[in-house]
């Protein structure tokens, strides 16, 4: 599945569930006894009825059964958390605690848990799947050049921040278009890269983007309140970039949001008489705080319009965005990073 032999430590990592930022391929050698004992406890009351040859289930205590299941789930979760903490402390090699933390972000593992539906693009070929696993755990990607087209030493982290080839722009534009498509379902007057009203006279003291050609990525009406125009600016950051390693992923997203707010918020409020929402994402699938609030609001409005469950809409949104980011990452990994090859 991985395409190579793995170490004992890597096998332990892969055995943890996706919600712990891992892979979810359990090791039956380690979990067989625990799962058997759990099965015995869950079926104990039913087994006793069978032994006593009861003809109906009137003596079957369903409430007690539910309590047993609940306690087993709690115990299992505690066991997995201990395993996760132990593995995180013992990590050596390319996979770091930072990788584990990034992979635990909400929605980061949605590409592993969704149905592989080719009709909506929720599937990878063999090489793409293995490359995705390597990116997820910081492993070396097979058959990639030692040096980047820009002349620097090649690595996954360098590939995802190298401007040559236009892949950073492609990643941004793809996510911008996905968000615009979501908004068209429930918002009005959706525009991509709308021009802002020029600053004149009394507005010359406004901080942030002052140039006449300034434009955020998207604008639309009706998300936060009826008729209100909101501007959005998208940014996808790679949190394992060398300049970010001293900052936690959550702090990094908040910092980048503040930078976006300083650039556009005052102009959106005072000149456009609208509002501004920064949409920050990471290459691992994490969302910034304001992006999370935005998607919750969007999912709520879509679910009410389509009569679907909110959880289903939100899950679809997370999966769609995750695949959008993942595909742009995979293209950058295998693409040519030459200066003359500008895309976008």
Which sequence ranges carry the predicted segments?
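Active-site metal-binding core of divalent-cation-utilizing nuclease and nuclease-like domains
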Residues: 123-154, 178, 182-243, 253-259, ...
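Short Cys/His-based metal-binding microdomains
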Residues: 23, 27-33, 37, 145-175
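Contiguous terminal or domain-adjacent regions
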Residues: 306-344
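Conserved, well-structured core segments
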Residues: 15-21, 27-30, 218-221, 229-236, ...
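Extended C-terminal regions of large enzymes
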Residues: 7-137
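E2/UBC-UEV (E2-variant) core
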Residues: 236-285, 291-318
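Acidic carboxylate-rich catalytic motifs and surrounding loops in phosphoryl-/glycosyl-chemistry enzymes
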Residues: 4-12, 16, 192-198, 274-285
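A short acidic (Asp/Glu
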Residues: 30-32, 201-204, 288-292
